[in-house]
Amino acid sequence: MKDNPPLFAGQVALVTGASHGIGAATARLLACLGATVAVNYHHDAGAAARVAEDIRAAGGRAVPFGANVTDAEAVGRLVTDATAALGPIDVLVLNAAGIVHPAKAPFLQMPQDVLERAVLAQLRAVTLPARAVGAAMAAAGAGSIVVVSSGLARDPQPGFVDVAVAKAAIEGAARALARELGPHGVRINVVAAGPTLTRATEWAGEEDFRRWASRTPLGRNASPGDVAGAVALLASPLARFCTGAYLPANGGVIMP
């Protein structure tokens, strides 16, 4: 049997929030599977450059692009620049959360504007790039978009109402966009990460990590690479008949 080409051979992928954590792991994995990767970052240019350098050192192709994906003009420039440098975008991974610091406060003590800002930031971080890239994908008649969400949307925990509501909003947006863009050949799916060992969970203590791990049948918390694998699966041609799908990468904490 002849060797099959890499899953993403000849494709360009844009990964938002790719300087650290799940985004960085996803960028590296997609590149390993043949994609040319646009590594988006907001603040940490050095970390994004290191991700791109790692990819190039392994024989792949990657370029970092700075942009705040909650800003429409910045997103427009990001997509224009990435397309000019790398070619039309075939895969869009919407990993940037837009929520820099979750409030981690009970709802009754959480200011209303904090909740509303979290929801708006997350919605903009998903819908602005999806609009900018989705238009070109629809015109081309093909494309794959994966939204990275959180298990908190369906299994909310005390103190995280801002994250739970924001993630539920983007999951609803993903389903709605899957309906609208499907006739144009564009697939949109959701990966919901369980507790993952990233900068976003640095606030947690050892007892928190043990408690989270104890809830999973697999007995451990996720690594960024665990979630990246689920993203790559849904983004790839292997999932060519999947759209509007919800894939939890949580070790079995939630079994929908």
Which residues does each PLM region occupy?
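Short, small/polar-rich loop/turn modules that mediate ligand/substrate recognition or access, typified
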Residues: G182, R187, C242-G244, N250
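Conserved glycine-rich cofactor-binding loop
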Residues: V12, S19-H20
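Active-site helix of classical SDR
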Residues: A130, A166, A174
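Alpha-helical segment proximal to the catalytic Tyr-Lys
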Residues: A135, R179-P183, R240
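Catalytic Tyr-X3-Lys loop
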Residues: L108-T127, A142, V146, I170, ...
